[in-house]
């Protein structure tokens, strides 16, 4: 074990797990990959890990527990499935391993690094919401810091090629989880999430649209400033995250009320924020910004945990 880096395990040797491994190996001064865990001995992720000198096992969670260096593992990323995660959580907690959950299981609290990491820094299990949540909840939260958000709706459009079998099987979980997090983390009174799989060729990078409905007397310039500042904050750990165009406003008065879900015909201002997320291309293609923002956010959370908890303890 390195004297300056905290060993982590990555459970799930698919696209997300492999991208996480490459990110840590190339970019992290705080973490080292202590194990890559899969269930398919022929997976590309396990093969790459072996070539890079990372300890591997195709024995799943029990294979991880049996590795000679398991006792050194402090943090585990779970990039498998919601069902498997519940089993992994119980076994890892018994050994005091902190867990960063990239599945829809949501055993622990939702975490978006720029919004609420500090509130949950010492929780044993942190859930990374969804790719759409990581891209859009920071914006909802920024707007909510300026004016009450009566309703927020997000549309995440991703390339079909970046949506693997896990994503396709969990569409309902994506919308439900993201909708809840828009309210619980973003601060909106009501929330709705929509995901669109775009089959266009060549594949398009991730696009996200955020709509927030706020009171007519909201300070629109303050909203613009808050959104631009928040985009810059997310961009620090997701370099491909950016505004696609200027923040837009549409006013609805007594003469042209807008029908808002759960509210009915209402007066207010519709705030529209258009984003795009380009992947860093560490392992995944650049158009897979939806996957890249998840791995980048998870890496950021793990590094903050390592710096705050383990480095200070000299572990």
From Swiss-Prot:
NAD(+) binds at residues 13-16, 162-170, 290. Its EC number is 1.2.1.10. Pfam families: AcetDehyd-dimer, Semialdhyde_dh. The active site is at residue 131. InterPro entries: Acetaldehyde_dehydrogenase (IPR003361), Acetylaldehyde_DH_C (IPR015426), NAD(P)-bd_dom_sf (IPR036291), Semialdehyde_DH_NAD-bd (IPR000534). It catalyses: acetaldehyde + NAD(+) + CoA = acetyl-CoA + NADH + H(+). Disulfide bonds: none annotated. GO terms for molecular function: acetaldehyde dehydrogenase (acetylating) activity; NAD binding. It comes from the Bacteria. The keyword NAD applies. Keywords: Aromatic hydrocarbons catabolism, NAD, Oxidoreductase. GO terms for biological process: catabolic process. Belongs to the acetaldehyde dehydrogenase family. NCBIfam families: ac_ald_DH_ac, PRK08300.1. This is Acetaldehyde dehydrogenase 2. It comes from Pseudomonas putida (strain W619).
């Amino acid at each position: 074990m390195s004297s300056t880096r905290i060993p982590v395990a990555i459970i799930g040797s698919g696209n997300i797990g492999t991208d996480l491994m490459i990110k840590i190996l190339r970019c992290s001064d705080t973490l080292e990959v202590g194990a890559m865990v899969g269930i398919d001995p022929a997976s590309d992720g396990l093969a790459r890990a072996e070539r890079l000198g990372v300890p591997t096992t195709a024995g799943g969670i029990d294979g991880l527990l049996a590795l000679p260096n398991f006792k050194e593992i402090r943090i585990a990323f779970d990039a498998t499935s919601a069902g498997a995660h519940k089993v992994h959580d119980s076994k890892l907690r018994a050994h005091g391993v902190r867990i960063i959950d990239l599945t829809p299981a949501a055993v622990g609290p939702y975490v978006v690094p720029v919004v609420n990491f500090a509130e949950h820094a010492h929780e044993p299990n942190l859930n990374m919401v969804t790719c759409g949540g990581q891209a859009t909840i920071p914006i909802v939260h920024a707007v909510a810091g300026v004016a009450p958000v009566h309703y927020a709706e997000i549309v995440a459009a991703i390339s079909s090629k970046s949506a693997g079998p896990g994503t396709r099987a969990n569409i309902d979980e994506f919308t439900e989880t993201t909708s809840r997090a828009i309210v619980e983390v973003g601060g909106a009174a009501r929330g709705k999430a929509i995901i669109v799989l775009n089959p266009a060729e060549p594949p398009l990078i991730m696009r996200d649209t955020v709509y927030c409905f706020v009171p007519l007397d909201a300070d629109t310039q303050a909203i613009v400033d808050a959104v631009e500042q928040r985009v810059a904050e997310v961009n620090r750990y997701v370099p491909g995250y950016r505004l696609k165009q200027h923040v837009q406003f549409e006013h609805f008065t007594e003469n042209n009320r807008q029908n808002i879900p759960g509210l009915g015909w209402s007066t207010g201002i519709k705030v529209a924020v258009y984003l795009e997320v380009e992947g860093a291309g560490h392992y995944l293609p650049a158009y897979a910004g939806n996957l890249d923002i998840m791995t980048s956010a998870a890496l950021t959370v793990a590094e903050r945990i390592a710096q705050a908890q383990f480095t200070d303890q000299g572990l």
